[in-house]
């Protein structure tokens, strides 16, 4: 698209005349907002109106969200949780929501400050990579779908071994994917194991496919004390498509050779029948999936930076995941500084940023939200909605550039109108003089 403007309604003619005299009119505002009432927000404690505490603080002082929105029915939020955390771990909140314009303000509840590792000598950096890949896919798909929810994935395993929880740290225990223990009749982990699972009821599903990226030692009962290279895949029984990958790193789970941890890829799968296959080590099966329903016309999601005050370590994985054209990232330039609750809740600038949810705007773009659809000094990049006409800044005042055709037509019509007015004035003046002469 060039920097020419689409013809506007006649009422904007005055704006055309005055735009060179006005500087800074209808600039983009750094807020998250919506074009109409068809929106939804996914959040954590900073937008959780149901959180209850008895510490003498003012009511709802932990919110960055305006309390007027608490009863809007357009928010799914849980203190201490996030979509990533609920997707992978037993600490689960059933995030469910639907809207055309989707906003995310969560993610900080799984950050480097938690330092999660699957194994004692594991690597939290791998989990930060998992987080970035998860949100990148989630944002991309929610620019195309209205509805998000969680579903349980049923599976059938023909062996006698049971699920095992080998990936846990402090208060978090991984349960997606599910790990199946080694069958007792095998001496080591060099065997093929498989299980069937079914995906149904949604347009598409987001599921994890994970491997321990490195050399995994078998159990203490393994007489050979062998190390294994993890290999996992999902096979679509209906279509014949295979998804899979192997571990590639030369790391282990010892103090001398640390770094072994779970690396996850995130897949978008269609409804159908699948087979999970492990060629070595533990079999993994998806136990939960994000259910995507109701396709919509492409509409970028808006993501608000989810971070702690600088006294606690944060990450930038949601910023890494939020990329054009499917995502607009919103942030403030200052350190997060909470108010009466604590330093991590109730930041003044983030409250301003989220105050845009109280009203509709005309246009949402990369630079922010535009209140009006008439004129702006900034061209809306990746604009959605009824976006303003372009106006370039030149010298000391803006110079408005419009599509020349409607401007020429307006000039012709204005010239004709002037000629008609002059003709009528002369006609009535001549008519008046004739009548005076006859009198």
UniProtKB/Swiss-Prot annotation:
Question: What are the disulfide bonds?
Answer: 49-70, 118-167, 202-291, 210-264, 322-327, 363-387
Q: Which domain of life is it from?
A: Viruses
- What residue ranges are annotated as transmembrane? 408-428
User: So which stretches are on the Virion surface side?
Assistant: 23-407
Catalytic residue positions: 45, 342, 345
Q: What does this protein do?
A: Structural protein that makes short spikes at the surface of the virus. Contains receptor binding and receptor-destroying activities. Mediates de-O-acetylation of N-acetyl-4-O-acetylneuraminic acid, which is probably the receptor determinant recognized by the virus on the surface of erythrocytes and susceptible cells. This receptor-destroying activity is important for virus release as it probably helps preventing self-aggregation and ensures the efficient spread of the progeny virus from cell to cell.
Q: Where in the cell is it found?
A: Virion membrane; Host cell membrane
Which GO terms of the molecular function aspect are on file?
A: host cell surface receptor binding; sialate 4-O-acetylesterase activity; sialate 9-O-acetylesterase activity
Signal peptide (UniProt feature, chain positions):
1-22
Record InterPro entries: Capsid_hemagglutn, HEMA, Hemagglutn-estrase_core, Hemagglutn-estrase_hemagglutn
Organism of origin? Rat coronavirus (strain 681) (RCV-SDAV)
Swiss-Prot/TrEMBL keywords: Disulfide bond, Glycoprotein, Hemagglutinin, Host cell membrane, Host membrane, Hydrolase, Membrane, Signal, Transmembrane, Transmembrane helix, Viral envelope protein, Virion
Coiled coil, from the record = none
Q: Where is this region: Receptor binding?
A: 133-281
Report the family membership: Belongs to the influenza type C/coronaviruses hemagglutinin-esterase family.
Entry protein name:
Hemagglutinin-esterase
């Amino acid at each position: 698209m060039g920097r020419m403007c689409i013809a506007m309604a006649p009422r904007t003619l005055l704006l055309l005349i005055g735009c060179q005299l006005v500087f800074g009119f209808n600039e983009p505002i750094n807020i998250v907002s919506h074009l109409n009432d068809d929106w939804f927000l996914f959040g954590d404690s900073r937008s959780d109106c149901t959180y209850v505490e008895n510490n003498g603080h003012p009511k709802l002082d932990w919110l960055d969200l305006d309390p007027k929105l608490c009863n809007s029915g357009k928010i799914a939020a849980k203190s201490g949780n996030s979509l990533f955390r609920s997707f992978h771990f037993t600490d689960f909140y059933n995030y469910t929501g639907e809207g055309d314009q989707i906003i995310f303000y969560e993610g900080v509840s799984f950050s480097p400050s938690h330092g999660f590792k699957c194994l004692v000598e594991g690597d939290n950096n791998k989990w930060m990579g998992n987080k970035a890949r998860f949100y990148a896919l989630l944002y991309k798909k929610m620019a195309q779908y209205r509805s998000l929810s969680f579903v349980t994935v049923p599976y059938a395993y023909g062996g006698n071994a049971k699920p095992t929880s080998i990936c846990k740290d402090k208060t978090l225990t991984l349960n997606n994917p599910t790990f199946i223990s080694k069958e007792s009749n095998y001496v080591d982990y060099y065997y093929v194991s498989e299980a069937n699972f079914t995906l149904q009821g949604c347009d598409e599903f987001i599921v994890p496919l994970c491997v321990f990226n490195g050399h995994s030692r078998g159990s203490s009962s393994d007489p050979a004390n062998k190390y294994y290279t993890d290999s996992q895949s999902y096979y679509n029984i209906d279509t014949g498509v295979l998804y899979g990958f192997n571990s590639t790193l030369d790391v282990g789970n010892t103090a001398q050779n640390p770094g072994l941890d779970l690396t996850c890829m995130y897949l978008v799968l269609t409804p159908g029948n699948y087979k999970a296959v492990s060629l070595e080590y533990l079999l993994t099966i998806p136990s939960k999936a994000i259910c995507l329903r109701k396709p919509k016309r492409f509409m970028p999601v808006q993501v608000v930076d989810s971070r702690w005050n600088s006294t606690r370590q944060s990450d930038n994985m949601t910023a890494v995941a939020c990329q054009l054209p499917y995502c607009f990232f919103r942030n403030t330039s200052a350190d997060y500084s909470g108010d009466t609750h604590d330093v991590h809740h109730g930041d003044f600038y983030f409250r301003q940023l989220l105050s845009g949810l109280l009203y509709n705007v005309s246009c949402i773009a990369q630079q922010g939200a535009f209140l009006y659809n008439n004129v702006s000094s900034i061209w809306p990049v990746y604009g959605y909605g009824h976006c303003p006409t372009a106006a370039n800044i030149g010298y000391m005042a803006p110079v408005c550039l419009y599509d020349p055709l409607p401007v020429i037509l307006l000039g012709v019509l204005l010239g004709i109108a002037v000629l008609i007015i002059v003709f009528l004035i002369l006609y009535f003046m001549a008519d008046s003089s004739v009548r005076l002469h006859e009198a």
